[in-house]
């Protein structure tokens, strides 16, 4: 989709160059690099969140989402332990395992990802991630934490 948008922009630019000339292009054509409000709000919020140094960051969103990838990248760059999942199915609540993706696309699996005891978890999601997906991930985190606590009591 992004590639198609860029191709349309290039076609429009060439058309304006032919019609108005290269020297007059700036008067008739302007390129701006923008992101949607929802994406900008999430990026601003995660910068504030990582400044609070949570124990874990949970990034929720599609693996094909560039804005979600950037949220994971921000968290990684802040040296926060972070896990990017696209669905709650990536969290094995019974065995305290999580399958997750890095910002550069590598899939990983981590055992004992949710430590015992009190911790602070930051959570964010990509701009187009449905609320239901985020809710399911939160539920899986709570279930995992309950399993971890129950296991330590045995």
Short names for language-model regions:
Residues 1-112, 144, 148-150:
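Redox- and metal-dependent alpha/beta enzyme cores, enriched for Fe-S-associated oxidoreductases
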Residues 60-62, 123-128:
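Glycine-rich beta-strand-to-loop/alpha-helix junction loops that act as flexible
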Residues 113-117:
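Short, glycine-/small-residue-rich phosphate/pyrophosphate-handling segment
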